[in-house]
Design a protein with these regions (language model features):
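A structural motif corresponding to the C-terminal end of an alpha-helix
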Residues: 71-84, 113-124
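Generic detector of short, locally flexible boundary/turn motifs and exposed helical patches
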Residues: 48-53, 88-91, 114
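Intrinsically disordered regions, especially transient/low-confidence alpha-helical propensity segments
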Residues: 14, 41, 92, 142-145
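Long, well-ordered mid-to-C-terminal structural blocks that present hydrophobic/aromatic surfaces
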Residues: 57, 65-66, 85, 94, ...
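Long, positively charged, glycine-interspersed low-complexity recognition regions
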Residues: 96-193
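Secreted/periplasmic serine-hydrolase-like ester/acetyl group-modifying domain
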Residues: 1-80, 174-193
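Active-site segments of SGNH/GDSL-like serine hydrolases
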Residues: 74-101
Length: 193
């Protein structure tokens, strides 16, 4: 059995990927009732209590020294002949738009991650065009319910020998959702007037 006895699977063992994505969306919706950013409720509570940083200007730095670390990792594993598939996950686009880290800044970093992997011999599964898709991310940057289904599906493909296509993500198709109401109430609570 693949599951620990106390863990009950959310779907049947033979569920299709579409069924799993639908179930993941249901679970995500049930766990993000307290806010419009699809951030899991316990994390949102910490944000509201000012126990998590809202100002995150240090993130999405195109000149981060971590890019050299990534390059070295990809080159080393490629030279060793390792069968590695890197996964580039998005951030929560609606949340980052709200706190002032705009889409173009995030996309520049996503593109640099993608090119660093590909240009150094790596294969990448790029999910960064899903930063506005509900429940792919569970807070600001951590993979969420639906995101895990995408990753699991790609792992299964990879294990079956189906390599990802190292294509460039078309960010023009990844548009922020239309705002249906004013962010004023959230802004006032967080002191971002």
């Amino acid at each position: 059995m693949l599951f620990r006895s106390e863990v009950k699977p959310a779907t049947r063992e033979d569920a299709s990927w579409d069924e799993m994505k639908h179930k993941a969306a249901d679970i995500g919706k049930a766990n993000t009732q307290s806010n419009k950013y699809d951030i899991r409720d316990p994390y949102w509570k910490l944000i509201k209590q000012n126990k998590r940083k809202i100002k995150r200007d240090y993130e999405f730095n195109i000149n981060s020294p971590e890019f050299q670390d990534l390059k070295l990792l990809v080159q080393t594993l490629h030279a060793a002949g390792a069968d590695v598939q890197y996964v580039s996950i998005p951030s929560n686009g609606r949340w980052y738009d709200h706190i002032g880290i705009k889409k173009d800044r995030r996309e520049a970093v996503y593109k640099k991650i993608h090119s660093t992997v590909v240009d150094n011999g790596g294969k990448i599964y790029d999910l960064t065009n899903k930063d506005y898709e509900k429940y792919v991310i569970s807070d600001a940057v951590h993979i969420g319910w639906k995101g895990w289904v995408y990753v699991d599906q790609q792992i299964a493909r990879h294990m079956d020998g189906h390599a990802p296509k190292n294509h460039e993500v078309d960010y023009s198709k990844n548009k922020p959702p239309h705002k249906h109401h004013n962010d004023r109430q959230d802004d006032q609570h967080q002191g971002n007037k």
